[in-house]
A protein has these predicted regions:
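Metallocofactor- and cofactor-centric catalytic cores in central/energy metabolism, strongly enriched
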Residues: 1-151, 155-299, 303-387
Length: 387
C-alpha cells in the first residue's frame, strides 16, 4: 500500500506542506500569531514556556520546538524570539539543525527594532517559504514511511471495548506495512505495565517500560499525590470507567499486539520503520500529542468515548469513538464510528481495514474533522513550576 506525500531534503516524507512560525518563548507567541495571520499557508502555536524553567523542563521545550521544525509535515520554519529568554535563538537553531536541514530563518524582536519591524521581516521570510513550498508536488511512497501517534482522551467503557482496539488493529497493520506506531500516555500504563513489558522485544525495553511508569509514581508521591486520585478523571467516571486499572487496560489496546521495540523520552526523534514503540508522555492530551508530533508523527489517531475536538497545528488528527451516542452528538468532531464492533454489525478486522484506507486518504491530503474546523491545541509537558 502506498500514499502520496512530500519528500523532504532530510529524507523523510510529509503528508502536509506547512510553513511553521515558531515562537521560542511566551514573549514571542503573540508576535508569531500576528505573523501567521498575514501569511496563508503558515501555522503557529501559543508557546507558554521557553523561559524561567528548570533544566529538565527547558529540555522538554527545546525538544518540542526542534521536533516541530523537523516534523516532515513542515516545509520550513521561521523562528521568532524576543531575545532575552532562556531558550536563546542560537540554542533553538542548533537543536533544529541537529534534526533537519530544511529551510530555516530567524528573527529576534529586540534586535529587529521592535514588534512591527520583526513582523515585517518574518512575514517576508514566511511568504517566500510558502511560495517555495507551493511548487512541491506529491510523490508516491510506501506506507512504511508513516509514523502514526496514538492517543485516547475523554475515555469511557467503549474506549477499551471498541475504539482503542480499533486503533490497535490499525497499529498492527501499519507495523505490517513496515511503518511505525507510537503508544503514549505513561500514566495510563499504570496497573497494566506488566502486560506491556511482556511484549518488549529486548530486556532493555522491558526494563525501560517499568522505569518510566515507576518514575511517574515516585514523582507524584514526592509531592504527596496519588495518581488514582486524579485518574480516572471526573469525566471518565461519569462515562462509566471504574478505576485506573480498567482505564490502563483499555489504553494499551492502542498498541495492538506487536512487539514493543523501543521506548523514547518525551519529544525525542523517533526513527522510521521501527514497528511499535512507546513514548514517555503525560496523559494530558495536547501535551501527549505534541510530544509524538515532535518525535516525527505525521498523523495522530485519537480515541474518545465522551468526545473531544482536539487537533494539532502540524499533524492531522483522526478522531474515533466507540460510543454511538457520542458519534451522533458530536459528528462534527468525530471521523470514525467504531460502535459497530460492540453491536456485532462489523468486525474489528473489517473496520481496521477501513481505518487503514482512511489513514491512507488522510496521508494523501484528505482533511480530518479537526483540521477542517481549525483545531490546533498545543501544550508542552513540564515537571516543575516556573523559577
Amino acid at each position: 500500500m502506498n500514499f502520496y506525500g512530500y519528500k523532504r531534503p532530510d529524507g523523510r516524507v510529509g503528508v502536509r506542506n506547512k510553513v511553521l512560525i515558531l515562537p521560542a518563548s511566551v514573549c514571542a507567541s503573540d508576535t508569531t500569531r500576528i505573523i501567521s495571520q498575514q501569511v496563508v499557508g503558515s501555522v503557529t502555536f501559543n508557546n507558554q514556556l521557553g523561559c524561567s524553567q528548570v533544566a529538565s523542563d527547558q529540555q522538554f521545550t527545546m525538544d518540542v520546538m526542534a521536533g516541530y521544525a523537523a516534523n516532515p509535515n513542515v516545509y520550513g520554519t521561521v523562528v521568532v524570539s524576543l531575545g532575552c529568554e532562556n531558550c536563546q535563538m542560537d540554542l533553538v537553531v542548533e537543536a533544529i539543525r541537529e534534526r533537519t536541514n530544511k529551510p530555516l530563518k530567524q528573527v529576534i524582536i529586540q534586535e529587529a527594532g521592535g514588534t512591527l519591524k520583526a513582523i515585517d521581516m518574518a512575514v517576508r521570510y514566511a511568504k517566500e517559504m510558502v511560495e517555495e513550498a507551493s511548487l512541491l508536488q506529491r510523490e508516491e511512497f510506501p506506507m512504511s514511511e508513516l509514523i502514526i501517534g496514538t492517543e485516547c482522551g475523554g475515555s469511557d467503557p467503549t474506549s477499551g471495548l471498541a475504539s482503542n482496539p480499533l486503533i490497535g488493529q490499525l497499529s498492527d497493520l501499519i507495523v505490517k506495512e513496515g511503518g511505525t506506531s507510537i503508544l503514549s500516555e505513561t500514566t495510563e500504563f499504570i496497573g497494566a505495565e506488566h502486560i506491556l513489558a511482556r511484549r518488549a522485544a529486548t530486556p532493555e525495553v522491558h526494563d525501560r517500560i517499568y522505569e518510566i511508569v515507576h518514575r511517574y509514581e515516585k514523582a507524584l508521591q514526592l509531592v504527596g499525590e496519588e495518581v488514582r486520585e486524579g485518574n480516572p478523571s471526573p469525566g471518565n467516571k461519569a462515562g462509566g470507567l471504574t478505576c485506573l486499572e480498567e482505564k490502563s487496560l483499555g489504553c494499551i489496546h492502542k498498541g495492538g499486539h506487536s512487539p514493543v521495540n523501543a521506548v523514547y523520552d518525551y519529544g525525542k526523534q523517533v526513527e522510521a520503520k521501527q514497528g511499535l514503540v512507546i513514548m514517555d508522555t503525560p496523559g494530558n492530551d495536547p501535551s501527549s500529542v505534541a510530544g509524538m508530533v515532535a518525535g516525527g508523527a505525521q498523523i495522530v489517531v485519537f480515541s474518545t468515548g465522551r468526545g473531544t475536538p482536539t487537533g494539532n497545528p502540524l499533524a492531522p488528527v483522526i478522531k474515533i469513538t466507540g460510543n454511538k451516542l457520542t458519534y451522533a452528538n458530536m459528528v462534527d468532531n468525530i471521523d470514525v464510528d467504531a460502535s459497530p464492533i460492540i453491536y456485532g454489525t462489523k468486525t474489528l478486522e473489517s473496520l481496521g481495514d477501513e481505518l487503514l484506507k482512511l489513514t491512507q486518504k488522510v496521508a494523501c491530503g484528505k482533511q480530518t474533522k479537526a483540521e477542517s474546523l481549525g483545531y490546533t491545541e498545543m501544550a508542552i509537558a513540564r515537571v516543575c513550576n516556573f523559577v
